[in-house]
Every structure is written in structure tokens, then in C-alpha cells.
């Protein structure tokens, strides 16, 4: 399919069926689009909308976000996952405040230099908010292009990604780029979906190689399968009345900056930790274990619950917090921690 025909058909479809009333599309600004694009990485639109609205209510400008404590940013992000996005968002806001006087940058080089912003995200920010001519290549766009032009191979491989970038550059029109880029994301999300694509409703069906051959399931190519390693983590749920001990993780790494239960490799090291602090372990109870899966490994979590009558022994340690179950503080929590806190709130650990 010729590039001009491709873009014309996509734009025509967008004018009739595309999404135009998402919260970040109303009174568009680079800040709003940036926030939405970061949230939409690895996350569905329906999930993102309430988070976006809460962020905008609390941080209406990039300066408000820059001035906020990281704990509060992580707290508002809790549940969205991939927490490095939130840490990078906060860092980038501080960079905008420091280097650009609080005004969101409007050149590709400056936007792409922000933490957590790559080529596609920078292109999306500038094209969607300011109409600047930059192609994009998020997961939805990769899928549409790979199927239409039968680009074989996993897009995580550099040569496959380069082919897709080349196609994106060719089909992105000089006029109407903001509509076109939004249309391509909408097509991938609404029509050219991972499974059960609605080919009969697609504006590209007359020129799509995968549709013609009924071979959509081959594109884009799958990531080579690998068996995820398994690890075990013992979580200590130390509870005094309505309060539970949490410790803040280091800024980088797994659950960076979030508050979690003290974690141990095995029960023996957990008991040693208690003994060093002269905390009796007589009532230590193992709760139901469960699995939490990261992108690169499985973590089998074994919660160990211990009610205590006092908590003076732990408060001299840095970055610890007695989390009040009845009046929860505004801090970022890892998803399994949130789950266990909810369990403790019911008053019946199992």
C-alpha cells in the first residue's frame, strides 16, 4: 500500500471513529500528553484514566509535580505498576523545573533527554500536543505496521524495530500528524488488537498483507520464550494494634522508593532479625503464600505475621514507618504489600 493511501485512509477513519475526548485530549498541553504517554506505557487506557485525573488534580502543572515529595508521587501511582515510570516522571519534572524554568520543553532533543522518555514518547508528546511532525512507534503502532506490511520477527530485535521505524516515517503525513498518530494508536487499541482483530472494520484491510492471508497471528513476531526463574521472599508482617511495620526500599532497583514489609531470603534469617532486636517470635504465624510475577522472575511470597505488644526496638532504624491501617499515610506501596495490608485490615490473617 502506498504511504499516501495508507495515511489518507487512517485519517478518514479517525475523523469518523477515533478517540477525541480522552482526559488528556481536552485542552491539550505537552505536560498533559507527557503524563498520559508515560502512564500508557504497558497499561490500558481504561486503567490509566482515573490515575491521570488524580495526578492532574494534585499536580496541575509540571512545577507542582517537581515540588512534590517522591513518596506522594509513588502513593498516587500505587496500583499502576512499573514504578520506575513514576520515579522517572518525578525526576523529569524536576529537570523541567531546573533546566527549563518550569516550562515543558518543545524541541525533540530536549524532550527526548528527559528521564524515561524515548524516541516514540518524545514524538508522541510533540506531535499530539503541538502538531510537530514526528513519527511514533509504540506497541499499537508496531502491531498495525507489522501486520499491514508483513514485517516478520520480534520488534524487540533492532533490525525489526528499524524496519518498523522506517515504515512509520514513510506513512506519517506532513499534514494532520497529530490526528494520524492518535489514529494509529487507536487502530491498534480498538481494531488491530493482539487477539481477535476486527479486520472487517479496519480502514487498511484492502492493503493489509496479514488480512489478505489471514495471517495476523504471525505479526508482530513473538518474543523468544524463556523460563522465568523463581525466587522466594519471606515478608515479616510485624503488627502492633492497628499499625504495621514497613521499610522504604532503596531508590533504585526492585520496588525502588516504595514501602514494603521487611523481606528475607528464608525463615531463619527472619528469626535472626527478630532475635537481634529482642523481639519474641513465639506467636510468629505463616499466612497463605502467593506468587507475584515480575517481567524477569517469579517471586513466591511467604507472609509471616507477628503481633507484638510494643515496637520501640525498630524505630531507631532509618526509613521505617509504622503504617496505620485505620488512617493510612500517603506513601507508595508495592502491589503485594497493598494486598497483605488489605488482608490485615479485615482483622483475620490467613
Predicted regions span which residues?
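Intrinsically disordered, low-complexity, charged terminal extensions of DNA damage-control enzymes
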Residues: 1-20, 25-26, 189-350
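Catalytic cores of DNA base-excision repair glycosylases
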Residues: 2-4, 8-200, 204-217, 230, ...
Amino acid at each position: 500500500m502506498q504511504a499516501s493511501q495508507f495515511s489518507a485512509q487512517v485519517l478518514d477513519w479517525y475523523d469518523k471513529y477515533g478517540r477525541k475526548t480522552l482526559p488528556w485530549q481536552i485542552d491539550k498541553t505537552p505536560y498533559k500528553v507527557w503524563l498520559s504517554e508515560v502512564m500508557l506505557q504497558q497499561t490500558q487506557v481504561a486503567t490509566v484514566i482515573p490515575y491521570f485525573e488524580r495526578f492532574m488534580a494534585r499536580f496541575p502543572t509540571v512545577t507542582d509535580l517537581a515540588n512534590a515529595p517522591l513518596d506522594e508521587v509513588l502513593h498516587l501511582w500505587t496500583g499502576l505498576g512499573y514504578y520506575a515510570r513514576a520515579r522517572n516522571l518525578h525526576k523529569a519534572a524536576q529537570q523541567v523545573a531546573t533546566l527549563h524554568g518550569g516550562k515543558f520543553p518543545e524541541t525533540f532533543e530536549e524532550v527526548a533527554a528527559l528521564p524515561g522518555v524515548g524516541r516514540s514518547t518524545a514524538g508522541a508528546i510533540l506531535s499530539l500536543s503541538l502538531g510537530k511532525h514526528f513519527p511514533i512507534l509504540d506497541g499499537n503502532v508496531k502491531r498495525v505496521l507489522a501486520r499491514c506490511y508483513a514485517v516478520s520477527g520480534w520488534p524487540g530485535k533492532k533490525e525489526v524495530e528499524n524496519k518498523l521505524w522506517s515504515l512509520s516515517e514513510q506513512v506519517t503525513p506532513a499534514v494532520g500528524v497529530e490526528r494520524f498518530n492518535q489514529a494509529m494508536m487507536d487502530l491498534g487499541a480498538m481494531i488491530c488488537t493482539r487477539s481477535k482483530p476486527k479486520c472487517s472494520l479496519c480502514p487498511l484491510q484492502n492493503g493489509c498483507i496479514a488480512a489478505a492471508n489471514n495471517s495476523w497471528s504471525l505479526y508482530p513476531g513473538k518474543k523468544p520464550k524463556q523460563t522465568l526463574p523463581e525466587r522466594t521472599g519471606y515478608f515479616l508482617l510485624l503488627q502492633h494494634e492497628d499499625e504495621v511495620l514497613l521499610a522504604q526500599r532503596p531508590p533504585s532497583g526492585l520496588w525502588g522508593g516504595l514501602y514494603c514489609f521487611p523481606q528475607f531470603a528464608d525463615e531463619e534469617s527472619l528469626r535472626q532479625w527478630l532475635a537481634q532486636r529482642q523481639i519474641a517470635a513465639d506467636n510468629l504465624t505463616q499466612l497463605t503464600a502467593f506468587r507475584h510475577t515480575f517481567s524477569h522472575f517469579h517471586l513466591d511470597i511467604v507472609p509471616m505475621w507477628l503481633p507484638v505488644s510494643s515496637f520501640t526496638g525498630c524505630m531507631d532504624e532509618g526509613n521505617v514507618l509504622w503504617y496505620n491501617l485505620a488512617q493510612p499515610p500517603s506513601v507508595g506501596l508495592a502491589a503485594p504489600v497493598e494486598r497483605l495490608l488489605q488482608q490485615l485490615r479485615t482483622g483475620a490473617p490467613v
